[in-house]
Amino acid sequence: MLIWLVELANHVQFFNLFRYITFRTGAAMFTAALIVFLFGPKIIASLKVRQGKGQPIRADGPQTHFKKSGTPTMGGLMILAGIVGSSLLWADLSNVYVVATLLVTLGFGAIGFYDDYLKVTKQSDKGFSGKARLAIEFLIAGIAVFFMMEAAKISAPQGPHLATSIAFPFFKDALLNVGYFFIVFGGFVIVSAGNAVNLTDGLDGLAIVPVMIASAAFGLIAYLAGNAVFSGYLQINFVPGTGELAVILGSVIGAGLGFLWFNAPPAAIFMGDTGSLALGGLIGTVAVATKHEIVMVIIGGLFVMETLSVIIQVFWYKRTKKRVFLMAPIHHHFEKKGWTESQVVIRFWIIAVGLAMLGLATLKLR
């Protein structure tokens, strides 16, 4: 919204700063953190009163988790307030990619909120029906992908070909044109990202820091992909307008820092599905917009690892009635093996940093 003040730059030189994505990204980060810091305590107090017993703890989980009983969930509301409030101020709201990303973020956040509500009111880890939840997620993601695809057809130098193509890292101009099937592919990427982050959110601080790391990496990718000079130099696909997504990702980092203040162990609040689904969907949407869906598998490798551990566990148990892991997702497996919660969390953070650096390295490998 404040980008419109650029029109006054001829009269007030300071407003010229609003032209620059880098300035607005930094401002969005600061604003989002400030929003969470200011309103966080009130939101936590309100949720604690309304929820009573807080988020239900899995009976088959590690024994150390039972002391967390009574901790409120739905902390994602704080994160969403920071992201949306900051983005409305600093991002270009006429940008299709910005609107699509906020649509997915709010849509997935609403699904997560309803899921959290059911879990809290029923005091059960069973929330929203899995099939219904996935169907709504795919609908929201599909709408977002369609509009981003149509925007790319008009603005991208390669036009319709790039808009409906899957890009591959390591190879220059390696594109697989799948036509309108790209809506299905893009929707799958976004939904998978949302649920992968959701599965990772099982320990204090475990999900939010890797989300911030991935956001920083994709913030750089968005800025480069939206810049004709930088994308040309790196030989990555130029998608005009995607640079504006760096502003939203800046707000994610700011909101994440604010949330971590309250989520640091012992957590005063959990983000719940409200936050994890929204954040994962947001990152997935940026990956689709910038044509870095496959690179997301590397940068978000920690989330992929968590998801695969669940898939393997369920598949193998159905076939053999035996478990590959002591408990899934895999962070619980390491807890069962004797790692402390802080050991699991910090070591997983280190993995997330390494994977983000590896993912960014692919930008230069052509």
Swiss-Prot record:
Residue pairs linked by disulfide bridges in the UniProt entry: none
Gene Ontology cellular component annotations, sorted alphabetically: plasma membrane
Record carries keyword Secreted: no
EC number, UniProt record: 2.7.8.13
One Gene Ontology term from the biological process aspect of the record: cell division
Protein name according to UniProt: Phospho-N-acetylmuramoyl-pentapeptide-transferase
Top EC class, one word: transferase
Cofactors named for this entry: Mg(2+)
Function, as annotated: Catalyzes the initial step of the lipid cycle reactions in the biosynthesis of the cell wall peptidoglycan: transfers peptidoglycan precursor phospho-MurNAc-pentapeptide from UDP-MurNAc-pentapeptide onto the lipid carrier undecaprenyl phosphate, yielding undecaprenyl-pyrophosphoryl-MurNAc-pentapeptide, known as lipid I.
